[in-house]
Amino acid sequence: MQPNDITFFQRFQDDIMAGRKTITIRDESESHFKTGDVLRVGRFEDDGYFCTIEVTATSTVTLDTLTEKHAEQENMTLTELIKVIADIYPGQTQFYVIEFKCL
């Protein structure tokens, strides 16, 4: 069995599969992904594989520069997005946006 390259919380699986979530915002530990990378995707909770994605773009962002567009790409409101990112990465301000599409 191949290992997964990236994981998402299970609550995001349906949005990813339906194309409603098209970016992920990560910290420096996952800043190495590049445009064109093809990644196996698993659930964070059990590492179960659920799809393959292709990275279509990467960029950097801070909590202060998150926009409504980022929130739309995450399928949530900007307020929700800022809270989710702050909860997952407490005390951090610099992040890496990974845009993707399901294959």
Curated annotation (Swiss-Prot):
InterPro entries: AC4CH, ASCH_domain, PUA-like_sf. SMART domains: ASCH. Keywords: Hydrolase. SUPFAM superfamilies: PUA domain-like. GO terms for cellular component: cytosol. Its EC number is 3.5.1.135. The active site is at 21 (proton acceptor), 24 (nucleophile), 74 (proton donor). Belongs to the N(4)-acetylcytidine amidohydrolase family. PANTHER family: UCP029143 FAMILY PROTEIN. Catalyzes the hydrolysis of N(4)-acetylcytidine (ac4C). This is N(4)-acetylcytidine amidohydrolase. It comes from Shigella boydii serotype 18 (strain CDC 3083-94 / BS512).
